Amino acid sequence: MSFFENTRKPVGLGGKIMVAMMNLGHSPVARWGLRFLELTLDAKVLDCGCGGGANMKRLLKKCPRGIVKGIDYSTVSVEKARSLNQTAIQEGRCVVWQGSVERIIFAKDWFDAVTAFETVYFWPDLPRCFREVYR
């Protein structure tokens, strides 16, 4: 798998390196965007394409009594996101699910906010995925 192919769905050792690079490299734009996201202290947030979980960690800080759930289809990304957010997972404030944004398993109208950082260009069918997120 080429370096750039590993950005779409990180796998193996190269994927682990890629996820670490994404957590770091996407940080400036994510921090900028999160400044504009107003959340209540007990907000319920979904992060689509959560990658290595760095933005989930930031979201958990913005809503310290809330719940943040993440979805990603890369096993490597899910493992990293779970590791990075282990404390919040143990507290019942965080869930990381492996799956596709095309088919979100969570209940309709459950979330107060949905985020997707540096990921929509990987979504297979944008209109379908956005309809799924909107529900």
Where do the PLM segments sit?
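Conserved alpha-helix/loop element of class I SAM-dependent methyltransferases that forms part
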Residues: L24-A43, R58
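A short acidic, Gly/Pro-enriched loop at the edge of an enzyme's catalytic core
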Residues: E102-A113
